[in-house]
């Protein structure tokens, strides 16, 4: 079985992931909670929901 000879750096990993994320820009889905566009199978960046559960706190704008 193939095993990596050297560890991939964070920059290499994130660069590869960024290239793969561009594929989904044409297939954005609508968040059922807030109606914002989001990438499929990802947490909504606006409300923080995924599959009817709060995963992270929603974005808030500071009044000051």
Curated annotation (Swiss-Prot):
Q: Which GO terms describe its cellular component?
A: large ribosomal subunit
Q: What's in the keyword line of the UniProt record? A: Ribonucleoprotein, Ribosomal protein
GO terms, molecular function: structural constituent of ribosome
Q: Where is the composition biased (Basic residues)?
A: 1-16
What is one GO biological process annotated to this record?
translation
The region called Disordered is annotated at 1-22
- Alphabetical list of InterPro entries matching this protein: Ribosomal_bL32 (IPR002677), Ribosomal_bL32_bact (IPR044957), Ribosomal_zn-bd (IPR011332)
Q: Does the keyword Ribonucleoprotein apply?
A: yes
Q: Which family does the entry's similarity section mention?
A: Belongs to the bacterial ribosomal protein bL32 family.
Q: Which HAMAP family match?
A: Ribosomal_bL32
* NCBIfam families in UniProt: rpmF_bact
What name is this protein filed under? Large ribosomal subunit protein bL32
Species this protein is from: Brachyspira hyodysenteriae (strain ATCC 49526 / WA1)
* Upper taxonomic lineage: Bacteria, Pseudomonadati, Spirochaetota, Spirochaetia, Brachyspirales
